[in-house]
Swiss-Prot record:
Classification via InterPro entries: Alpha-catenin/vinculin-like_sf (IPR036723), Vinculin (IPR017997), Vinculin/catenin (IPR006077), Vinculin_CS (IPR000633)
Name the record gives this protein: Vinculin
Domain remarks in the Swiss-Prot or TrEMBL record: Exists in at least two conformations. When in the closed, 'inactive' conformation, extensive interactions between the head and tail domains prevent detectable binding to most of its ligands. It takes on an 'active' conformation after cooperative and simultaneous binding of two different ligands. This activation involves displacement of the head-tail interactions and leads to a significant accumulation of ternary complexes. The active form then binds a number of proteins that have both signaling and structural roles that are essential for cell adhesion.
Organism: Gallus gallus
Region spans: Facilitates phospholipid membrane insertion: 1004-1047, 1121-1135
Region (Disordered): 837-888
Region called Talin-interaction, residue ranges: 168-208
Keyword tags: Actin-binding, Cell adhesion, Cell junction, Cell membrane, Cell projection, Cytoplasm, Cytoskeleton, Lipoprotein, Membrane, Myristate, Palmitate, Phosphoprotein, Repeat
Keyword Transport set for record: no
Stretches the record annotates as C-terminal tail: 879-1135
Regions of compositional bias (Pro residues) in chain numbering: 860-876
Length: 1135
C-alpha cells in the first residue's frame, strides 16, 4: 500500500496515480461499455524507460551503501516494479494488435496497480534508510550524554562542551529539515517541540555539570543536590531524544502517545495517595476530628486520584476501582454527617471509620495492581520496539553471528509477557501462535547459517519471512496493549460535549462507549472542581454531577434493553442534554474563579525562595525560613499545575491549547524540585558564583515555563469571564480591608491590599496580551487607554494602604485608602467594558399604523423581458494543473541518485497528460469515441447565495439510523456541523455540505455499492475540488481576521486539507484498481479500504474544524474588509 508521509514521496506518487486513474477508466470503458482502448505504446515506453532508470540507480545505491536493511529490502521492490512494467508493456503490445483484448485489459489494470505500489515501496525503502541516518546521529548524542556522569573536572567539562556542541547542531539541522519534509502536522509539531526542549535544556545541563564539578572539587555542601540536578537534566534530554527517534519512525498518525502519559498519571496518583494516607488515617482514627478539616480533605483527594487512575483502566479493573471510590465516598459523607451531629464516638461511627480505613487500603492495592499491569505491558511494547531494529539488521546480514538470534528471543519473550496479560483469549492465542512460527523459522535459518548457507536463496527467503513475521508480531502486541486501555474521550470540553451529544441523540448506535466516556470525564472533572469548593457551592456542583450521572445511566440502561428510541428514552435524553448544559456552565464559572484566585500571582513564592537562599549566613533562623519558603513554593507550584489542568479540561480551549497546558504542567512538576535543589545548593554555599548562576538558570527556566502556562490558561478561558471574576474578587478584598480597619487589624489590611494590587496587575497582564494579539485599532486603543488608567491607580492605593497600616485608627487615612480602592474598581470596570462587544445600533421603531395611508396611484408596470438575447455560453473548465516536482533548495541533502531517478519517473508521468493529445488524435483516427468531459473539472453551478436552505439532497444521509460505515459516519459528522448554518451568502458552508454529500457517495462506492471505478475516481476528484475551495475561502477569512490567535488556529487547521485531499485521490485510485478484481487478497483489499477510511475521517474532521475556526474568525473580521461571509444559524442556540 502506498504511504506518503513526506512531501517528496507524495509529489512523486500523485502524478503517477493521476495517470493510472486514466488507465483504470480506459479499462472500465472497455470492460463495461465495450469501447476500444487506444494505442498506449508511446506513453508506456516512456514509463518503461523511467522505471528502468529508477531501478538501475536503485541498484547502484544498494551496491554502494553500508545499510544492510536497505540492501535486503530494495531487491523485492525492484522485482515488483519491473514485473508491473512488464505487464504494462505486454498490455500495450496486445492492445495495439487488438484494442478490445480482454487479457490485455487485465494486464493493464494489474500493471498499473503494480507500478504505483512498487514505486511507493522503492521510495519508502529509500526514505527509511534516510531516517536511519538521522537516528544514528541521535543515538550518538544519546551515548555521549551518558559521558556526563564521568565529567569531574573543569578541563573535562570544557572538552565535553566542545564535543557536544557540533553533534547537537548537526542533529538540530537534520531534524529541522526532516520536519519540513513531513506531511503529518502532528509529527512535525512533536519533532519541533522535542527538539526545542533539548535546545532549552542544553545550557541547563552545562550549568548543572558545572555546579557539580565545582562542589565536588571544593568539597562544598550540596553535592547530592547538584548530582540530582545533573542526572535529571541528562534523563530529560535523553527522554526527548528517544521521543524524536520514535516519531521519526512513524509513517501514519500516532496512536500510541497515550502509553507514557497514562503510566505517568498512574504513578503520580499513587504518589499523591501515599502522601495523603497518614493524614487520612489520622482523621479516621480520631472520633473527635471535625468534619471538613484537612484529614477529610485528604480522603477526598485520595478518592479523586484513585478515580483518575480508574478512568485509565478498562473492563473489570475499571469497574472495581471506580465502584470502590464511589462506595468510600458515600461512607465518608455518612461519617462526616455523624461527626457533624456530635456522634463521632458512637459504635456506628467508629465502625464506619474502620470500614473506610480498610477500604482505602484495598483501593490503593487495586490502583497499584493496575499501574503495574499498565507499566509491564508498556515496557514490553517499548522493549520490542527497541530490539526489532537489531533483529532486522541480523536478518539482513547473511554472515550475522548468534547475537541477532538473542534479539529475536528477547522480542519473543516480551511478546509472551504481553500475551499473558491479555484478557481476550483470541488475542492471546494469536500472539502465541505467531511466536511458535517465528521460533521454528529462526531455528531453521540459524541452522542454515551454521552450515555456511546464510547467503543461499532459501536462507534469504527465510530471513525475509521472519522479518515480515516480526513486524506482524509487533503489530499484534501493539493492538493487544491498546485494547486493554479504555476508549478515550476528547481532551477538551467542547470535544467531550460533542461526543456526549452524539450519543444522547442516538444512544442505540454503537460508538464504542465514547459518548458515555465523555460524560464520565465531564462528571469526574466536575467532582474534582467541587472538592476545592466549600459549603453550599460544593453541594450544588456535586448535585449537578450526580444528576448527569444518574440520567446517563438510565439512558444507557434503556439503550441496552433495546428501548433507546422509546418516548421514555427521548424524555431522559432531553433532560440529560439540559443537565449537561447546566453542569458545563457551573463548571466553567467555578474554574474561572479558581484561575482568578490561583493565577493572580505566579512568581512571588519563587522570588521569596530566592531571597531565603541568598540570605547572609548569619541571618537568624536562616534554615527554618528557607525550608518554610521551599514548602510554600512547592505547594504553590502544585496549585498552579492542578488549576491549569482544570482550565484545560473545562475551559473553551482547543486541542492544541489543551496539549500545550498539559506539557507546561508536566514541565513545572519536573522543574519544581530541581529549583528547590538548586536553591539549597546556593543556601549551603553562600557567595559561590557558580551556585548563584545555576540557581538563576533553573529559576528563569521555571518562570518562563509558568509564564507560558499562564498565557495558555488565559487562552483556555473566556477573557470577559476572567475579568468579571477578578473584579468580584477585588470587591471582596476591599470588603475585607473595611473589616480590618474596623477591627484595627493592620496585617489583615496589608494582606487585602496586596491581593488587590496583584489582581489588578494580573488584569493588566491579560489586557496587554489581548492588545498584542489583536490588529483591530479601535479595540487596541480602547483597551490600552483603560489599562493605562488602571496602571496609574495601583501605586497610590499601595501607598495609601501602607499609610493606614502605620496608623490604622486615622479616619482620614482610611478614607484615602478606600477612595484609592474604589478608583481601582472603576478602572477595572473600564477595562472590562473595553472587552464588551458593541451592541448593534437598532433602527428606530416603525411609525404607528394610524398615520399610514394608501395612495390611489397604481404601481408602475413591470418592465418587459429582453428579447432576442441569448445567455453567454458556459466558459470551458480550467485544465487540470499537475503539481510541479518540488524544486531543490540550496544546501538540501536530498540530491541522491535515487531521488533524481524518481524525479524522472515523475516527469514522465506528467508528460503523459491528463488529456493526452496523441492518444486522442490516434483514437480519433481509429474512429474511437473518447468522452473528454469525463475528466472535466467538477463545476458547482449552484451559487451559495441562491441555494435553497431546504437542501432535499441531504435526505440521502439518514441521521437517525445506526451507521456502521466509518466513511459515512465521518460525512454525517461534517454534515451535522455544516447544517447548523445557512449556506446563503456563505461559500464555506456550501462547500462543506457538498463535501459531506460526496463523501457519503464515496462510502457507498468503496463498500461495493452502486457505481464503478470511474465513479470512485471522479468522486475523489470532486472532493479534492471542494477541499480546495474550503481552503481558499478559509485563507481569505484568516487574512481579514484581526485576532492573531484565531487566525493562526484557522490557518493551521485549513492547511492540512490540501495534503489530505491529495492523498485521498491517490488512495481512491489504488482502491479503484482493486474493484472487481479476483486476484487481490482480502487482506490487501481491506488494507486499502482501511487507509482510505482513515484518510476520509481525517479530511472530514479537518473541514469540520475549519468551519468552526472560520466562524470564530469571522467575528473578528476587519471592519473595512470587502470579503464577508454570512453566519446565520438555522436553529438558534436559544431554541
Amino acid at each position: 500500500m502506498p504511504v506518503f508521509h513526506t512531501r517528496t514521496i507524495e509529489s512523486i506518487l500523485e502524478p503517477v496515480a493521476q495517470q493510472i486513474s486514466h488507465l483504470v477508466i480506459m479499462h472500465e470503458e472497455g470492460e463495461v461499455d465495450g469501447k476500444a482502448i487506444p494505442d498506449l505504446t508511446a506513453p508506456v515506453s516512456a514509463v518503461q524507460a523511467a522505471v528502468s532508470n529508477l531501478v538501475r540507480v536503485g541498484k547502484e545505491t544498494v551496491q554502494t551503501t553500508e545499510d544492510q536493511i536497505l540492501k535486503r529490502d530494495m531487491p523485492p521492490a525492484f522485482i515488483k516494479v519491473e514485473n508491473a512494467c512488464t505487464k504494462l508493456v505486454r498490455a500495450a503490445q496486445m492492445l495495439q494488435a487488438d484494442p478490445y483484448s480482454v487479457p490485455a485489459r487485465d494486464y493493464l489494470i494489474d500493471g498499473s496497480r503494480g507500478i504505483l505500489s512498487g514505486t511507493s515501496d522503492l521510495l519508502l525503502t529509500f526514505d527509511e534508510a534516510e531516517v536511519r541516518k538521522i537516528i544514528r546521529v541521535c543515538k550518538g548524542i544519546l551515548e555521549y550524554l551518558t559521558v556526563a556522569e564521568v565529567v569531574e573536572t573543569m578541563e573535562d567539562l570544557v572538552t565535553y562542551t566542545k564535543n557536544l556542541g557540533p553533534g547537537m547542531t548537526k542533529m538540530a539541522k537534520m531534524i529541522d529539515e526532516r520536519q519540513q519534509e513531513l506531511t503529518h502536522q502532528e509529527h512535525r509539531v512533536m519533532l519541533v517541540n522535542s527538539m526545542n526542549t533539548v535546545k532549552e535544556l542544553l545550557p541547563v545541563l552545562i550549568s548543572a555539570m558545572k555546579i557539580f564539578v565545582t562542589t565536588k572539587n571544593t568539597k562544598s555542601q550540596g553535592i547530592e543536590e547538584a548530582l540530582k540536578n545533573r542526572n535529571f537534566t541528562v534523563e530529560k534530554m535523553s527522554a526527548e531524544i528517544n521521543e524524536i527517534i520514535r516519531v521519526l519512525q512513524l509513517t501514519s498518525w500516532d496512536e500510541d502517545a497515550w502509553a507514557s502519559k497514562d503510566t505517568e498519571a498512574m504513578k503520580r496518583a499513587l504518589a499523591l495517595i501515599d502522601s495523603k494516607m497518614n493524614q487520612a488515617k489520622g482523621w479516621l482514627r480520631d472520633p473527635n476530628a471535625p468534619p471538613g478539616d484537612a484529614g477529610e480533605q485528604a480522603i477526598r483527594q485520595i478518592l479523586d486520584e484513585a478515580g483518575k487512575a480508574g478512568e485509565l483502566c478498562a473492563g473489570k479493573e475499571r469497574r472495581e476501582i471506580l465502584g470502590t471510590c464511589k462506595t468510600l465516598g458515600q461512607m465518608t459523607d455518612q461519617l462526616a454527617d455523624l461527626r457533624a451531629r456530635g456522634q463521632g464516638a458512637t459504635p456506628m461511627a467508629m465502625q464506619k471509620a474502620q470500614q473506610v480505613s480498610q477500604g482505602l487500603d484495598l483501593l490503593t492495592a487495586k490502583v497499584e495492581n493496575a499501574a503495574r499491569k499498565l507499566e509491564a505491558m508498556t515496557n514490553s511494547k517499548q522493549a520490542i520496539a527497541k530490539k526489532i531494529d537489531a533483529a532486522q539488521n541480523w536478518l539482513a546480514d547473511p554472515n550475522g553471528g548468534s547475537e541477532g538470534e538473542e534479539h529475536i528471543r528477547g522480542i519473543m519473550s516480551e511478546a509472551r509477557k504481553v500475551a499473558e496479560l491479555c484478557e481476550e483469549p483470541k488475542e492471546r492465542d494469536d500472539i502465541l501462535r505467531s511466536l511458535g512460527e517465528i521460533s521454528a523459522l529462526t531455528a531453521k535459518l540459524s541452522d542454515l547459517r551454521r552450515h555456511g548457507k546464510g547467503d543461499s536463496p532459501e536462507a534469504r527467503a527465510l530471513a525475509k519471512q521472519i522479518a515480515t513475521s516480526l513486524q506482524n508480531l509487533q503489530s499484534k502486541t501493539n493492538r493487544a496493549v491498546a485494547n486493554t486501555r479504555p476508549v478515550k474521550a476528547a481532551v477538551h470540553l467542547e470535544g467531550k460535549i460533542e461526543q456526549a451529544q452524539r450519543w444522547i441523540d442516538n444512544p442505540t448506535v454503537d460508538d464504542r462507549g465514547v459518548g458515555q466516556a465523555a460524560i464520565r470525564g465531564l462528571v469526574a472533572e466536575g467532582r474534582r472542581l467541587a472538592n476545592v469548593m466549600m459549603g453550599p457551592y460544593r453541594q450544588d456542583l456535586l448535585a449537578k454531577c450526580d444528576r448527569v450521572d444518574q440520567l446517563a445511566a438510565q439512558l444507557a440502561d434503556l439503550a441496552a434493553r433495546g428501548e433507546g428510541e422509546s418516548p421514555q428514552a427521548r424524555a431522559i435524553a432531553a433532560q440529560l442534554q439540559d443537565s449537561l448544559k447546566d453542569l458545563k456552565a457551573r463548571m466553567q464559572e467555578a474554574m474561572t474563579q479558581e484561575v482568578s484566585d490561583v493565577f493572580s500571582d505566579t512568581t512571588t513564592p519563587i522570588k521569596l525562595l530566592a531571597v531565603a537562599a541568598t540570605a547572609p549566613s548569619d541571618t537568624p533562623n536562616r534554615e527554618e525560613v528557607f525550608e518554610e519558603r521551599a514548602a510554600n513554593f512547592e505547594n504553590h507550584a502544585a496549585r498552579l499545575g492542578a488549576t491549569a489542568e482544570k482550565a484545560a479540561a473545562v475551559g473553551t480551549a482547543n486541542k492544541t491549547t489543551v496539549e500545550g497546558i498539559q506539557a507546561t504542567v508536566k514541565s513545572a512538576r519536573e522543574l519544581t524540585p530541581q529549583v528547590v535543589s538548586a536553591a539549597r545548593i546556593l543556601l549551603r554555599n553562600p557567595g559561590n558564583q557558580a551556585a548563584y548562576e545555576h540557581f538563576e538558570t533553573m529559576k528563569n527556566q521555571w518562570i518562563d515555563n509558568v509564564e507560558k502556562m499562564t498565557g495558555l490558561v488565559d487562552e483556555a478561558i473566556d477573557t470577559k469571564s476572567l475579568l468579571d471574576a477578578s473584579e468580584e474578587a477585588i470587591k471582596k478584598d476591599l470588603d475585607k480591608c473595611k473589616v480590618a480597619m474596623a477591627n484595627m487589624q493592620p496585617q489583615m489590611l496589608v494582606a487585602g491590599a496586596t491581593s488587590i494590587a496583584r489582581r489588578a496587575n494580573r488584569i493588566l497582564l491579560v489586557a496587554k496580551r489581548e492588545v498584542e494579539n489583536s490588529e483591530d485599532p479601535k479595540f487596541r486603543e480602547a483597551v490600552k487607554a483603560a489599562s493605562d488608567e488602571l496602571s496609574k491607580t495601583i501605586s497610590p492605593m499601595v501607598m495609601d494602604a501602607k499609610a493606614v497600616a502605620g496608623n490604622i485608627s486615622d479616619p482620614g487615612l482610611q478614607k484615602s485608602f478606600l477612595d484609592s480602592g474604589y478608583r481601582i474598581l472603576g478602572a477595572v470596570a473600564k477595562v472590562r467594558e473595553a472587552f464588551q462587544p458593541q451592541e448593534p445600533d437598532f433602527p428606530p421603531p416603525p411609525p404607528d399604523l394610524e398615520h399610514l395611508h394608501l395612495t390611489d396611484e397604481l404601481a408602475p408596470p413591470k418592465p418587459p423581458l429582453p428579447e432576442g438575447e441569448v445567455p453567454p455560453p458556459r466558459p470551458p473548465p480550467p485544465e487540470e494543473k499537475d503539481e510541479e516536482f518540488p524544486e531543490q533548495k540550496a544546501g538540501e541533502a536530498i540530491n541522491q541518485p535515487m531521488m533524481m531517478a524518481a524525479r524522472q519517473l515523475h516527469d514522465e508521468a506528467r508528460k503523459w497528460s491528463s488529456k493526452p493529445v496523441t492518444v486522442i488524435n490516434e483514437a480519433a483516427e481509429a474512429g474511437v469515441d473518447i468522452d473528454e468531459e469525463d475528466d472535466a473539472d467538477v463545476e458547482f453551478s449552484l451559487p451559495s447565495d441562491i441555494e435553497d436552505d431546504y437542501e432535499p439532497e441531504l435526505l440521502l444521509m439518514p441521521t437517525n439510523q445506526p451507521v456502521n460505515q466509518p466513511i459515512l459516519a465521518a460525512a454525517q459528522s461534517l454534515h451535522r456541523e455544516a447544517t447548523k448554518w445557512s449556506s446563503k451568502g456563505n461559500d464555506i458552508i456550501a462547500a462543506a455540505k457538498r463535501m459531506a454529500l460526496l463523501m457519503a457517495e464515496m462510502s457507498r462506492l468503496v463498500r461495493g455499492g452502486s457505481g464503478n471505478k470511474r465513479a470512485l475516481i471522479q468522486c475523489a476528484k470532486d472532493i479534492a475540488k471542494a477541499s480546495d475551495e474550503v481552503t481558499r475561502l478559509a485563507k481569505e477569512v484568516a487574512k481579514q481576521c484581526t485576532d492573531k490567535r484565531i487566525r493562526t488556529n484557522l490557518l493551521q487547521v485549513c492547511e492540512r486539507i490540501p495534503t489530505i485531499s491529495t492523498q485521498l485521490k491517490i488512495l481512491s485510485t489504488v482502491k479503484a484498481t482493486m474493484l472487481g478484481r479476483t486476484n487481490i487478497s482480502d487482506e490487501e483489499s481491506e488494507q486499502a479500504t482501511e487507509m482510505l477510511v482513515h484518510n476520509a475521517q481525517n479530511l472530514m474532521q479537518s473541514v469540520k474544524e475549519t468551519v468552526r475556526e472560520a466562524e470564530a474568525a469571522s467575528i473578528k473580521i476587519r471592519t473595512d474588509a470587502g470579503f464577508t461571509l454570512r453566519w446565520v444559524r438555522k436553529t438558534p442556540w436559544y431554541q
